[in-house]
């Protein structure tokens, strides 16, 4: 509503602030209603999927919903190799859709990993993420779930503005994410970006469509992601 309609139908209103994180914007509704803020994300609960590894493992979620949020096949393989070299079983997650499965078949062809794509419900996925030593994924819902589950989370961001849509760390966000930085960290979340002058553009890829590539992601170096991954893993699993 706006103008006279807002006054006619709403007892109280707050102005939309599109410059703050979306979680913070929603928490402001609680302030207006006099409800104490709870900045902790409550994730679904469920048991581990039957095929979950018994030893230490890492989770990679390589397939976002849209092409313009995809990284590179070579990048994902490099990260998986780095995790395996640190003694971690690599678990690949993903949805059941045909296009997503085809992309993951391409990414993980010939790889010695545990594939759980299409085999976890949300509760099982949440439990899996809570047990993982580290999670690496693009800007997608599972990345936000990993952050909420308390997993050390490495998020690969391209066109999306982390100031508005960055993963929300356990315990809340102590200060705003920067628009662009090679690596930035708050709590259990690390955001990795390739610093193009146009990043973050908030557009659907360089060709302005869901199926286009984003140069800021395609040029994101595996070494940069692996460096953030090592920070997230901590000293005991670094090389």
Task: Report residues per predicted region.
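Catalytic machinery of carbohydrate-active enzymes
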Residues: 1-239
């Amino acid at each position: 509503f706006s103008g006279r309609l807002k006054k006619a139908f709403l007892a109280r209103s707050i102005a939309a602030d599109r410059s703050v994180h979306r979680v913070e914007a929603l928490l402001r509704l609680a302030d207006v209603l006099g409800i104490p803020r709870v900045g902790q994300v409550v994730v679904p609960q469920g048991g581990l999927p039957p095929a979950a590894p018994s030893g230490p493992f890492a989770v990679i979620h390589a397939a976002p919903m849209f092409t313009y949020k995809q990284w590179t096949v070579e990048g994902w393989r490099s990260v998986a190799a780095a995790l395996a070299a640190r003694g971690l079983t690599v678990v690949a997650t993903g949805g059941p859709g045909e296009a997503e499965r085809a992309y993951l078949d391409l990414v993980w062809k010939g790889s010695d990993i545990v594939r759980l794509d299409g085999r976890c419900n949300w509760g099982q996925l949440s439990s899996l993420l809570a047990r993982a030593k580290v999670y690496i994924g693009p800007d997608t819902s599972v990345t936000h779930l990993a952050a909420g589950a308390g997993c050390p989370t490495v998020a690969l961001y391209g066109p999306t503005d982390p100031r508005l849509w960055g993963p929300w760390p356990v315990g809340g966000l102590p200060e705003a994410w920067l628009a662009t930085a090679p690596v930035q960290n708050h709590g259990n979340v690390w955001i990795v970006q390739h610093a193009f002058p146009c990043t973050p553009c908030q557009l659907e890829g360089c060709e302005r469509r869901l199926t286009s590539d984003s140069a800021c992601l395609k040029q994101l170096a595996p070494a940069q992601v692996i460096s953030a991954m090592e920070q997230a893993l901590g000293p005991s699993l670094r090389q």
